[in-house]
Amino acid sequence: MVVILEHEIPQGSQLYFGKSARLKRRIEERASQILYTAGFEEIITPSFSFLEHQRDTSSREVLRLSNEKNHQIALRNDTTLDVVRIITKRLGRSTEHRRWFYIQPVFSYPTNEIHQIGAESLGEADAKSMLKVAIEIFRSLELEPILQLSNMRIPLLCAEHSRLGLEVFAKMQVEKIMASEEYLGELLQIKNAQDLQRVTSKVPSFLKEELEKLRALAEGIEYPRFVFAPLYYAPMDYYNGIFFRMFEGNSTLLSGGIYEMDELQSCGFGLYTDQLIEKILRHNEG
């Protein structure tokens, strides 16, 4: 039998105290002020929900237990899913508000605790508006991570019209992509607005509309560190079109985009508070 010492906490759970706890509170306060100003209201969803309300009831990631009536209960695993369900199914007659934010953790198997600050604009697929709010939050913290703009529809369409499987784009197997259709190599070279405009005029017609959506998203965004990644693909539970993320090194600090859930097209993002705290503390110590 393995002896568990009194000072140990489960791997993947989070502990903040002193300087780190103060930083966490400062991040949350600044984000909430910006979100309130942008017309969002806060929602705090239950930590528990019925297992049948999860997108994938068989997922090993979901922590589950039973209540006194033997109903299967899940510990909060996806706040976006909960917000959409609760606003549309439970509070639909009580509020017409459609812009909501949350500051709370999600949990996954075995003992992972992930603190998030998220915002959802239900029934509004305005990615540019959401992106500007995300940028403002980082600027309030005097941070400018790299901003990546992508469109999940582009690799999906490329896989459909080429000999390549979607996994080639998910793993970003550059050699296979370059050895395939010429336009795929061109898409790989896109980094800035000039590249995007040049390549859009040369690609097959089935891609032009999706590339135009990327151009429209970037137009008017004043941010010094952003790149286009039109072939970026990461399997997501619901993001299937315009997608953006902000990262530094190997750490993703925020991700978001347009999604459809319960026949409602919406847009949102999630800021990963734990990653952000770690980055700021390391920078201050360095």
Swiss-Prot record:
One Pfam family, short name: tRNA-synt_His
Tagged with keyword Amino-acid biosynthesis: yes
Pathway(s) of this molecule: Amino-acid biosynthesis; L-histidine biosynthesis; L-histidine from 5-phospho-alpha-D-ribose 1-diphosphate: step 1/9
Signal peptide segment: none
Keyword annotations: Amino-acid biosynthesis, Cytoplasm, Histidine biosynthesis
Highest taxon listed in the record's lineage: Bacteria
Any one biological process term the GO annotation gives: L-histidine biosynthetic process
Localization (cell): Cytoplasm
GO CC, alphabetical: cytoplasm
Protein task: Required for the first step of histidine biosynthesis. May allow the feedback regulation of ATP phosphoribosyltransferase activity by histidine.
Alphabetical list of PANTHER family matching this protein: HISTIDINE--TRNA LIGASE, MITOCHONDRIAL-RELATED (PTHR43707:SF1), HISTIDYL-TRNA SYNTHETASE (PTHR43707)
General remark: This function is generally fulfilled by the C-terminal part of HisG, which is missing in some bacteria such as this one.
Family assignment from sequence similarity: Belongs to the class-II aminoacyl-tRNA synthetase family. HisZ subfamily.
Name used for this protein in its record: ATP phosphoribosyltransferase regulatory subunit
Organism per entry: Wolinella succinogenes (strain ATCC 29543 / DSM 1740 / CCUG 13145 / JCM 31913 / LMG 7466 / NCTC 11488 / FDC 602W)
Highest classification ranks of the organism: Bacteria, Pseudomonadati, Campylobacterota, Epsilonproteobacteria, Campylobacterales
Gene: hisZ
